[in-house]
Amino acid sequence: MKIIILTTSTDHHLFFVNELKKKFEEINVILEKKKNHFSFKTSHNYQKKRKKFEKYFFFKDKNIKFKDEKIFYDVNNKNCINYIKKIKPSVIISFGVGLIKSKFLNEFKKVKVVNLHGGNLNYYRGLDSHLWTIYHKDFNNLLTTLHTVKEKLDTGDIILTKRVYIHKNLPFEGIRAANTVSCVDIVAKYLKAIKKNKIIPIKKNKIFGRYYSAIPSVLID
């Protein structure tokens, strides 16, 4: 079973990739370089604390890097699509890249294309879903969701979900790390089911949550 992971060059994504590589062979990694830009301030000191926390949490401050990755500016570009075609994957997993466009999906109609979303699709679509969930004090919806990818962002059918548990010993900057551990768990479960030809019931997504952009830094204070 050939697997493609579409992601970006961050410590939490590196941890995700490395953990799955321990469990599954023939994983190919594509890193997207494209960045989001906003008309409002999104940078916050919390992000520096988060980076430091994740470096220790995942790697005990060791300098770990991606290996054998392929880098493209945009996963939707022709060169990236052609590269994936040559690999002939059974599954494409998106974690942290930008919008996957229709031209990409049309090229891989026979491939399972799935995405990891840090929230409940029925309430929170878009960016920074965990932060928006916490902002609204909606702690019951702190979820990690694995869903199919459709043209409209975060409207795919739900494959698996897992709660992201927060506790008194978990700092605010550790929430993304906790979510990443949940991401590893549900993707491993999904891939094992495919490998064993087991059927995972997919829940039709009939309620599309509100779309949120990146959370402004002023709301984190």
PLM regions with names:
Residues M1-D221:
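One-carbon transfer enzymes
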